[in-house]
Amino acid sequence: MSGKQKPKFEVRGYSEHKAPKPASPSASTILVSPNNEILLLHRVQTSSAFPSAHVFPGGNLEPSDGEVASDPTDVNRHLENIAYRTGAIRELFEETGILLARESRTAESLLPVSTAVRKEGRESVHKGKVSFKSWLSSISPNAVLDTDRLIPFTHWITPPNVPKRFTTQMYVYFVDPAEKGNPSVHATADQIETMTPEWRSARDWLSLARSGDIILFPPQFLLLYLVSEILDGPGDSEEDILRKRAILKRRIETEGTPVPWKDKFISPIGMSFGEDGRSVLALDKPGPELKASTLKGDDEYVVLVKFNREGPRDVEIGLRKEVLRERRERGIDKPSKI
């Protein structure tokens, strides 16, 4: 890239970074509305992570969320557990004001909490004046976080060449159609790290990214792609909505190669690049910290992406075998330095 500014975001081979920065445990939630729309946040330019990108709500775990192993190479540090689930719900609350909690362990519906009470609690939790769990107990003594309804949906580890790295557990949460009038599921901006939260269909988010109107990083793009294939299918009745959710849940829990999507650990790695300016990212490796483990990524799909100064552009998902064959036949494929 002689004479040009280097892209802010790239993905290269593991071999180029023998000692990557430790990956911070974090969690993120793909929140599905009663109408099967997806909530994304637009991070401001000065945000500490993924500036100007549209992202799922989420962030770093805190000690109050629960214990995770301190050694970055310890497999247990990366495995899904109650700390990740608690962190996902806490971060969702801090960033959007949405509260996924029930009045008790036996309650079926979400705890309704007014906008004013949530706003005050959100500010206190974010500033560290009170822990998230303590605040919840103060407004409803028997309340519990709705961690059981979080569905694990891949775990991502930032590539080794990126200075700020995360080991991120992704979840899906379906807001029950019966909760439409519950104030606890109404999102508002936090005025700190994000702009206004917005609900759109997964199809619409992908379309905006393809047209260049928004930035989606490869993990968000891939997960929206997989969600859109099912949730954006025909039918808008409540019966259709619930049917499509059941299909998506089954896909996450039982489909995928070599392991189901709920069990995939993915650290994108540059596989090849072409004269079209796009890299092909393989998704089958779990990351340098986990290379000695039995954890696996995905060997069916690849991500095609062009890394520009402002972030990833021209992102697309393809079947690995088909993409590599087509690029070789067209003569636009070159091996990476892996």
Where do the model's predicted regions map?
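N-terminal leader/linker segments that precede catalytic domains of diphosphate-processing enzymes
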Residues: 1-338
